[in-house]
């Protein structure tokens, strides 16, 4: 038996003895043990009751509680009629939101929002994602089925390209998911634009660019490069409409293509994949990166922006929320930096490096180069 296996067996035996009810009770009665027992109890309760916090936030968002209290601090009695709640129900909601750190009861007896609630009110896309998460909640009623590889019906229907087939989505479906992606694109674009200097590039092509929100933000921030977007026809039409309405419309070009089936336009010296690679399983990711590499001239660069698994401080998002989300969606998976690096190098890219971002929970950025 190897040393590692003996270590695992010894440690498991120790943990098995510690997990006995009498052991846990004995530890809880000790002065220091009691402190750790209480802390563990709180952590365990947070895990098993997390859905109640989610539903409290959803109720506050749907009733616009934070906006109402931002306009005027109120008591449960004064707020309840406007929410369509009884005073008792309103008080329950206010107390729950206060316990979650979203509201604060002032010395006047009225309630007002905390900075955490202001983030829900002010940050683009947060309200939309809270509402959208009801689909994920429905799909995760049976988490074992999702882990077995059976996609959930709600998210698979919302993302029409996520099924086993590769048919293009119809316009209404494309509008729905493009609007959701665009609602949070401002935060992502800000992270990417802060992480990398785009001004040295002549022609930037955003593959899978949706309705053009990222390229529009890039155009506002960097006056130089020509900007190209490639996406499915139903989505590309939305980008064309957005760009036509801009005073600098001549900077943009849109190509309606299925980037897994059709060669990409050449002549870009930078291609961006913003929240695209993680939507593909490994085989599709390899096909996509092969097309990207073929479209780039030697010395041109590829920028990948998406959340990465095992990112320090962001594991609850990348390793829990996002991993289960994509599993429920039925396609793609979040990858670690090493896994993305392996895919890039297998496609022929070199000099792969990670660029620092201010909020890795939102996105990480990897830059790679097509060698000469």
Language-model features: locations:
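Short beta-strand "wing" residues that participate in macromolecule-binding interfaces
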Residues: 105, 113, 304, 351-354
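Conserved Class I S-adenosyl-L-methionine-dependent methyltransferase catalytic core
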Residues: 22-202
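Conserved adenosyl
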Residues: 123-313, 351, 361-364
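Eukaryotic partner-binding/assembly regions in large regulatory complexes
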Residues: 1-22
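C-terminal alpha-helical "lid/dimerization" subdomain adjacent to the S-adenosyl-L-methionine
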Residues: 303-347, 352
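Core SAM-dependent methyltransferase catalytic element
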Residues: 348-372
């Amino acid at each position: 038996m190897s040393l590692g296996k003996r270590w695992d067996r010894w440690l498991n035996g120790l943990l098995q003895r510690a997990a006995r009810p009498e052991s846990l009770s004995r530890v809880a009665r000790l002065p220091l043990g009691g402190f750790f027992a209480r802390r563990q109890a709180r952590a365990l309760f947070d895990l098993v009751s997390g859905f109640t916090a989610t539903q409290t936030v959803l109720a506050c968002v749907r009733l616009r509680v934070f906006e109402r209290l931002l306009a005027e601090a109120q008591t449960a009695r004064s707020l309840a009629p406007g929410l369509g709640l009884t005073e008792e129900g309103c008080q329950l909601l206010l107390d729950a939101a206060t316990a979650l750190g979203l509201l604060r009861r002032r010395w006047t007896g009225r309630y007002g929002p905390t900075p955490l609630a202001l983030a829900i009110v002010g940050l683009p896309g947060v309200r939309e994602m809270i509402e959208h998460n009801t689909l994920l909640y429905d799909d995760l009623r049976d988490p074992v089925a999702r882990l077995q590889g059976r996609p959930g019906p709600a998210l698979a229907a919302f993302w029409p390209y996520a099924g086993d087939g590769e048919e293009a989505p119809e316009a209404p479906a494309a509008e729905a998911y493009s609007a959701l992606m665009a609602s949070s694109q401002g935060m992502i674009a800000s992270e990417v634009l802060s992480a990398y200097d785009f001004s040295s590039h002549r022609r930037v092509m955003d593959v899978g660019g949706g309705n053009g929100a990222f390229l529009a933000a890039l155009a506002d921030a960097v006056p130089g490069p020509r900007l190209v977007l490639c996406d499915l026809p139903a989505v590309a039409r939305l980008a064309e409409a957005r760009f036509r309405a801009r005073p600098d419309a001549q900077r943009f070009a849109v190509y309606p293509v299925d980037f897994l089936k059709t060669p990409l336009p050449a002549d870009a010296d930078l291609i961006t994949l913003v929240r695209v690679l993680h939507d593909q399983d490994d085989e599709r990711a390899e096909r996509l990166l092969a097309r990207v590499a073929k479209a780039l001239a030697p010395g041109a660069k590829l920028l990948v922006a998406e959340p990465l698994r095992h990112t320090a401080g962001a594991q609850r998002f990348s390793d829990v929320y996002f991993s289960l989300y994509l599993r429920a969606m039925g396609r793609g998976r979040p990858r670690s930096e090493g896994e993305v690096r392996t895919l890039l190098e297998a496609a022929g890219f070199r000099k792969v490096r990670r660029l620092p971002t201010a909020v890795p929970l939102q996105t990480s950025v990897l830059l790679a180069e097509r060698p000469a």
